[in-house]
Amino acid sequence: VHAVEHLNLDVLYESKIHGLGHIERTLCHGGMSAMDEHLSEADTSLLLDACAYHDIGRSRDGLDFEHGSVAARFIGLVTGRTGEDLLILKAAVEAHSRKEKEMQSVLDKYHPSDMARAKNIAQLLKDADGLDRVRICDLDENFLRRESSVHREPFAHQLYIRYQTVVGLPLVPDFVPEMLKHRNREKVWL
């Protein structure tokens, strides 16, 4: 709740797809991941910062492998993080928008001293973000990294339905049918 209440709305990307709703749901999934994975308070806070600001580098909706890199450049200014935490945060945020096979090279680029911690935060961010793909009718559990995330798939659907209902938005936004018509997701994230 604290992460949502203290969210810096001014830096979020404004969008029906990657805007506030997506960020709030990603924060919820991140918080649940932190509980499921028994993260420390420090790692929970770091993961929630990553969930909150992972899309601040977006300039458009759609497939964009570079927005994480742009977000990584600014995330220290937004969160006030420094040192090792900032390195891990930058690495996780950049890795979230890249293909799975590129994760390790992205993490290596930032040289965190605790690579296992960096990889853990990056994987949990990718799963929290991925669980909200229900909003675009494109959640595939084969792309989730953690068993706890796979088990949360039904919750992701319910969270999305309740969120949309509470805020008075359609369950299938107008952009989804057109997007589904044109998508070609085979091998995109491999």
Give names to the regions the model predicted.
Residues 1-9:
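Short alpha-helical hairpin
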Residues 11-40, 53, 81, 98-190:
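Divalent metal-dependent phosphate-bond-processing catalytic cores, especially two-metal-ion Mg2+/Mn2+ enzymes
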Residues 21, 62, 66, 84:
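A short glycine-/small-residue-rich loop at the edge of a beta-strand within enzyme catalytic domains
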Residues 79-85:
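Short helix-capping segments at alpha-helix termini
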Residues 2, 46, 88, 92, ...:
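Exposed alpha-helical structural elements
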Residues 42-62, 67-71, 75, 89-99, ...:
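His-Asp-centered metal-binding catalytic motifs of divalent-metal-dependent phosphohydrolases/nucleases
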Residues 31, 72-79:
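Amphipathic alpha-helical segments within well-ordered protein domains
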